[in-house]
Amino acid sequence: MASPLNQQSLGLLIKERRKSAALTQDVAAMLCGVTKKTLIRVEKGEDVYISTVFKILDGLGIDIVSAQTSDTETNGWY
């Protein structure tokens, strides 16, 4: 069973996926249609609108359900 995501773990997931795609914050922000400052806030787990988080997930091609399952299985959490 997947553990629930919180703001900080979701931010880390986004940051890890961005880095694994070899994207800078500037480029990722542009692809997602947000400012670099906003992307940084999301990656830090700070408060933002949920619509902004979905915009970033979509822009980076992250499926939150499979990402959460993959992340928890990698860490050995079932």
Curated annotation (Swiss-Prot):
Pfam families: HTH_3
Null mutant phenotype: Essential; a single hipB deletion cannot be made, probably due to toxicity of HipA.
GO molecular function, one term: DNA binding
Record flagged with keyword Cell inner membrane: no
Record-linked SUPFAM superfamilies: lambda repressor-like DNA-binding domains
Regions that span the bilayer: none
Induction note: Expressed in late-exponential phase; part of the hipBA operon.
Record InterPro entries: Cro/C1-type_HTH (IPR001387), Lambda_DNA-bd_dom_sf (IPR010982)
Keywords recorded for this protein, A-Z: DNA-binding, Repressor, Toxin-antitoxin system, Transcription, Transcription regulation
CDD domains hit by this protein: HTH_XRE (cd00093)
Stretches assigned to the HTH cro/C1-type domain: 14-67
Annotated function: Antitoxin component of a type II toxin-antitoxin (TA) system. Neutralizes the toxic effect of cognate toxin HipA; overexpression in wild-type or a hipAB deletion temporarily inhibits cell growth. Binds operator DNA; in the ternary phosphoserine-HipA-HipB-DNA complex the DNA is bent about 125 degrees.
Subunit structure as annotated in this protein's UniProt entry: Homodimer, binds DNA. Forms a HipA(2)HipB(2)-DNA complex with cognate toxin HipA; has higher affinity for the latter when HipB is prebound to DNA and HipA is phosphorylated.
Family: Belongs to the HipB antitoxin family.
Record-given protein name: Antitoxin HipB
Gene source species: Shewanella oneidensis (strain ATCC 700550 / JCM 31522 / CIP 106686 / LMG 19005 / NCIMB 14063 / MR-1)
